[in-house]
């Protein structure tokens, strides 16, 4: 691997779409060459959501939340840890590193904005959340910011 470049190879069994993203594409925060797969983004987002909900997160919690097997989650979490996105303490509790937190927060914001916008357009909430989960990974920062501004205006004017 090149210096300052990390690859996370995680396969999402439910998604044969193996898109690779850079943190640079997700957030305009300088020349980062970090690459991460869509499935890894989903795991980081799941850890963030569970941390906000429960305070503490274990691999089994991520398995229950995502519907994946414990061995699959353990492998994914190990790769995320090895690549500097997740920490695991002596009690098996998961945490997000600064790099992992940035990615998780970015994906979570995209998910919530897209879900709210699609719901405001009249899409059933469950379908909107599923669609948002697919869309959140492919939008450029510019497109997302424009869509977020439009969604905010649309939702405010609709009320």
Locations of the language-model features?
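C-terminal regulatory/oligomerization modules of transcriptional regulators
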Residues: 2-10, 16-24, 130-159
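Residue-level detector of intrinsically disordered terminal segments
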Residues: 13, 32-33
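Cationic, low-complexity basic patches in intrinsically disordered or flexible, solvent-exposed regions
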Residues: 28
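N-terminal helix-turn-helix DNA-binding core of bacterial DNA-binding proteins
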Residues: 35-68
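Canonical helix-turn-helix DNA-binding module
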Residues: 59-90
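Basic, amphipathic "hinge/linker" alpha-helix immediately C-terminal to the N-terminal HTH DNA-binding motif
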Residues: 92-110
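Arg/Lys-rich, alpha-helical DNA-contact motif
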Residues: 106-142
